[in-house]
């Protein structure tokens, strides 16, 4: 159960007395620390100077804060990328490489970061008026996610002298 500490004399724009809630948690996961991160890279040499890489990354579900609450958790995700590399032969250049990357090939919608603001409201239920707010047994959570890019392309040129 939360421990309630009244904050005497707190006054901010005539808010009067406020209450500070404190709750201790034990044996919780560390925020933004998934249990599993798996990365693989397969390289196929299509020709002597041309290669294709398939790069996959899986990240297990992870919590936004250190409470291990299901209301404050990011879903797991899998992202696949392709990289096509062509080695060029140029005069006066030791190494020349042209690279085309297609990131998030399957155009997955995922979020790998978020923020949380916890608050208590005793006279008003804000969860119906704001899509970013959900309620739990201890109060309300305002959660914002940072969605990652869908399919995107990157073209690069590497020159070594």
Q: Each PLM stretch: what is its role?
A:
Residues 40, 50-54, 82, 96-100, ...:
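Transmembrane beta-strands of outer-membrane beta-barrel proteins
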Residues 39, 64-74, 87-89:
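Generic detector of contiguous secondary-structure segments
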Residues 24-28, 66-72, 140-145:
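Extracellular loop and loop/strand-boundary signature of outer-membrane beta-barrel proteins
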Residues 81-87:
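Short, well-ordered amphipathic alpha-helices
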Residues 60-63, 87-161:
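C-terminal beta-signal and adjacent terminal beta-strands/loops
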Residues 1-62, 66:
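Gram-negative outer-membrane beta-barrel transporters
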Residues 34-36, 76-80, 94, 149-153:
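Residues that define the transmembrane beta-barrel architecture of outer-membrane proteins
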